[in-house]
Amino acid sequence: MNTKYIFVTGGVASSLGKGIIAASLAKLLQARGLRVTIQKFDPYINIDPGTLNPYEHGECYVTEDGAETDLDLGHYERFLGIHTSKANNVTTGKIYHTVITKEREGAYLGKTVQIVPHITDENKRRMLLLGKTGDYDVIITEVGGTVGDIESQPFIEAMRQLQWELPEEDFLSIHLTLIPYLKAAQELKTKPTQHSVQELQALGVHPDIIVCRTEKELSPELRHKIALFCNVKPGHVIQSIDAWSIYQVPLNMEAENLGKMVVDKLEIPGLPEPDLEALKAFLERLKHPLHEVDIALVGKYVELQDAYKSIQESVVHAGAANSCKVRVHTLQAENINDGNADEVLGKMDGILVAPGFGERGLEGKISAVKYARTHNVPFFGICLGMQMAVVEFARNVLGYAEAASTEVNPRTPHPVIDLMEDQKSTTIKGGTMRLGAYKCRLAEGSLARSIYGTEEIAERHRHRYEFNNAYLRQMQEAGLKVSGVNPDTGLVEIVEIPSHPFFIATQFHPEYKSTPEHPQPLFVHFVKACMDRR
């Protein structure tokens, strides 16, 4: 069987959920026994989102091989339970960088380098790249942006060319659009969708399936109207109605017959019925919890829902694993101090201090750590959260009042968190942090070892600063146990306080490897500790 290529575009408005639709379709195909992966093409000129402010772009998701990518790759991995890579996220910046580098090397033999064919050819090469590995039966490509945006037109043009270069049964186009509901008229309006599809068709791409995001049910008459004016088969207009959980969307799409439509169009015979039992069991636990807890998520970017997307989803997975409803209270670190910590955090069953960069909000994070440590509240720190746990311990247990990270105070007399040695000569910001999966050896008898149930793990990282091992002995003697280290470098990966009911913090980002069917163990045990306290 030839590799099949599916493209998902969006129209009318942004943030309709192309990534969720792409991941849901991938789940339906995977459940039928196909090998599927998803790639995201982003139209911005940044090489990657690694240097983007979370307020600009939401979470930066890190893959196993150390790529800093769009947060949609997190959805892909969570829905499919697979690892993506740097090849799964392409930006306009990467495309231009490749083409300009080739031009400087003389690869174009003196030709004038243009959007068409040089940029579009590179787009096509990247779109087909994963398919040529032989590892996948189906490649789903999510095209970022909204049809009509000037930035994404080279991607659409590459799609147009592939639509005619590939065999008809190997190419499929899905267009996700919005059907707004006007309360005054009490009507769903199809005109924006008609115009969006017409604009896509004017660019030479003819969608095979139209997925309509809607608050209300689409009547058969409306579906027929959309099909008529958008030139698709009547049965190929489907609805994606608002769901109570994003993990319900694959089941909704299966009920809409999306999986069968795609398989039939791509002419893939002999597939079994989809096996979605594990997903259904997860949703059953999620929908009917037996317990409930309240957890504080203390961060710097809490105003934007997507800034801590993987953490939020990991908590959902852990809650379902414990049959527990977890209410996450996102708290701005800048608003927390020693004086109000009891008022702000006193009703919480657990405290999670989130990752981040820079000085803003650090003292609030330290106050949150102190409250959790001194009031026996279950505590979980991630990346910067671990670093602030170390600073808090140094200040309030070791008595080093001026202890700090050199990230914010290069002249501190007690640099308990310091810049990694191999980072001190780095001047370029993009893609130069310690990124991707690294091994961590767990100490025998530690909480971390009991949680993971193994001696060695591999987790993903995104940081420049580390625990200063010059303070290792003092910290351990005072009660902060180092329970996880990198076996090659000795870099401290996990700290915990054995005398505390549950106090653990990691330099790595465990949230990047949690899925509904395989929830991350640290999150599962953190939620369990919160339940035990309640």
Identify the meaning behind each predicted range.
Residues 1-327, 333-350, 357-358, 365-371, ...:
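Flexible phosphate-sensing "switch/lid" loops adjacent to ATP/NTP-binding sites
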Residues 304-307, 320-324, 338-341, 360-364, ...:
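Extended hydrophobic-aromatic, low-complexity segments
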Residues 10, 40, 214, 241, ...:
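Active-site proximal loops enriched in glycine and acidic residues that flank catalytic Cys/His/Asp
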Residues 435, 439, 443-534:
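C-terminal and late-domain segments of enzyme folds
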Residues 16-19, 23-27, 31, 344-439, ...:
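Cysteine-nucleophile active-site neighborhood
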Residues 271-274, 380-381, 400-406, 449, ...:
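Acidic/polar loop patches that form or flank catalytic/metal-binding clefts of enzymes
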Residues 56-64, 243-247, 353, 374-380, ...:
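Short beta-alpha connecting loops at secondary-structure transitions
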